[in-house]
Design a protein with these regions (language model features):
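Gly/Ser/Thr-rich beta-alpha loop segments that engage phosphate groups in nucleotides
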Residues: 22, 44, 118
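Short, solvent-exposed loop/helix junctions and linker helices
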Residues: 3, 46, 113-114
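Structured helix-beta-strand junction loops
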Residues: 19-20, 58-59, 117
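A SAM-dependent methyltransferase catalytic signature shared across enzymes that methylate proteins
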Residues: 53-68, 125
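A C-terminal cap/extension of S-adenosyl-L-methionine-dependent methyltransferases
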Residues: 67-127
Length: 127
């Protein structure tokens, strides 16, 4: 989430959508795991489903929202509250991309996309 004025940006995006169009947002999830690393890479905040959908522009209707990277969320929580590593090493990123993300792709549907390190929201502009 690299946008300081998130509500205004969603309004601008909604204004560009044609009737029947979709707006898809992928954002970091759960403010409770916001870390110095988030800040270092330009994240202003993290969202849960309720918080992200609260930003719904008046011209759009929520269509779907779900979480991704369930295993990543658990590891981020461990890092945030136990290890307290401020930024990942290149080796950590390599393990994450090659192991954690593929395993999360298997785990996410099993947990119903109910939690994860990222959240996806989809809005539709009515016809």
């Amino acid at each position: 989430e690299h946008i300081e004025d998130d509500r205004a940006e969603l309004e601008r995006a909604a204004a560009r959508l044609a009737p029947g169009g979709h707006l898809i947002v992928l954002s970091p999830a759960y403010q409770s795991v916001y870390s110095p690393f988030d800040k270092a890479i330009g994240h202003f905040r993290r969202y849960d489903r309720k918080g992200l959908l609260a930003l719904t522009p008046p011209s759009l209707r929520p269509a779907r929202s779900f979480y991704l990277d369930s295993l990543g969320l658990m590891l981020s929580a461990v890092n945030r509250f136990v290890a307290r590593q401020s930024s990942p090493t290149p080796a950590t990123i390599k393990v994450w991309d090659r192991t954690i993300v593929p395993l999360s792709r298997i785990a996410d549907p099993l947990v119903g996309h109910a939690f994860g390190r990222s959240i996806v929201a989809v809005w539709t502009r009515p016809v």
